[in-house]
């Protein structure tokens, strides 16, 4: 909240949370595997209220509560977002919910519901990349389908997968072997400590490099790709 300049007082924040809970716009959940941690999420009534105010939404209002695994993924992805926000280089963070809405309801979507599409400003230039936080591995057949989608992506050149451990990193490198698009892989803990300067490995080379150098290498594609770009900016 402080990073978004929405609240600076803890008491004011707590009072706001209590009011939202009282009006059943938020749901309070205790997560057993989080050492008595508590998570607040938007309720169905809260989601309905936000839809009425023009927020992006894709999916059923009748879905049940998310599993603890999904909650943990969301919290750890949020840590990644906050770490990048603190650097001051983040321009836009488009979350999966907005991406899914765009993909399902418009003609200017991406090829995949990424965990986030990130825009950062480095050395006076804006760079975008797709971000995936792969907390647990998928079946190999799933990665074959993902590879085919990534091969057709035209909105950006860079793809970053963050993972919790090195074994999973190597598994993903192998899963993306043969993909003509370069996909980069790094450790989540390194990103939290170094953000864009973290060391990454690609599916095309065993040599590690800083992800910041990957983003800034070469020239950016010029802006102004016609109506498609103009419309896309509305969503990012």
Predicted features along the sequence, with ranges:
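A short, highly charged nucleic-acid-interacting micro-segment common to nuclease
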Residues: 61-78
